[in-house]
Amino acid sequence: MKILFEEYKYKPEELPSLEGIDPIELKDGGVKLPYVGYYYDVASAETIFILPKVFIIDSLAFNRYDPELLCKSQSAKEPLSADDQAFLFSLSAWLYQAIALFNERHPSNEITSPRSLAGVVGHKGKDDVTLLDHVLSLLRFNREHQSLFTYIATIKHTGQHRIHWTKTIRTTTPLVKGKTPYYLECRTKDKTVDYDEELICFFYSTLDYLKQSYHFVVQRHLNYKTEKPHRIANMIECGKGTRYLRKIRGKYFKDELVQLWNLLYAFYERAEEVAQKRVPNERLLVRNFNIVFEDMIDCLIGESELPKGLKEQKDGKIIDHIYRDKSLVDDDDIYFIGDSKYYKEGSSFGENSRYKQITYAKNVIQYNIDLFNRGAKSEYLRYRDELTEGYNPTPNF
């Protein structure tokens, strides 16, 4: 896994192979990438994430690392800690999912076209799934089904090593002292193949293999016996993963285990195609990631059905995000305003931008007061106190 940064100046020879992606050439001979997102190079089996430029602080990635270090294999002198590696994967996966969800929310956005709404480019269509999608699905299953793994392990070990008295009495001769028999060779329950555990061991073997490339943290509270990562890599290279899964498919009927089998089969099928170079390079990249970020924030906190005149105000102003939340002074709801268009990178916060931000709140307050004065019967938020006639403070950030 390699990490690049949007708009950071690299030397041409420092960039990994990015077929189909043209970096911007600078006058001094350097190059920079105008994208944020995910790229998988099939030829080198290398996963590449391009992170937003906002993470470059004082020419350092996260104010700690030389960005050029993160686009190379780790050196012995400057290795990343395990926590840093896990953080980089989590952040990169989050950005990838944000772009993918943006594409789903905007079906008219032609993802293979650089002329789309936010400049999204890639091979990932509506029904396409990348190798990273399969990895994230396996991690999600592990996170959400810890109780299943614990239950199967508990059932398996219940009664294990317990004496099988019927078999012991039938097959062994006791030592009799007085009238009391003593059995010196006790028979225990025969160990049978646990097919549930067989699938789970294969699942964790797969996660251990992927952990070498993506450096994520795997939650595993039980000590399942797993295969070495190089054995899993060999199975993928030889196409044995899907053959093995087809062989054991008929042994699973529990819904969760059938789901796990399907996830594993989908991953190995894709991984074997990649290993045999039968698929194109994967990419999901976006220009102007701030547009994706704004859309994500609006999806998380924005109101889907707002009265006309609140988001698009009468004086021509358009609020980025507006939503209902509890008032700061009582138990009623009021509108919270979130808008950052006057706080752009590199610009200072002056009187002009402060006035425009305040105008947003004044317009929202006036909108509700007008409804109150007209005696409108439709639901509206009360912004004037009945006793003091003072205005309810409106958060504006």
Task: Set out the residue ranges of the language-model regions.
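Terminal, charged accessory segments of proteins
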Residues: M1-T242, E256-V274
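Catalytic core segments in nucleotide and nucleic-acid processing enzymes
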Residues: M1-F49, E273-F397
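Short, charged/polar micro-motifs that form catalytic or ligand-binding hotspots
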Residues: E185-I200, G250-K254, R283-I291, G346-E351
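Loop-centered beta-sheet repeat module
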Residues: K240-D298
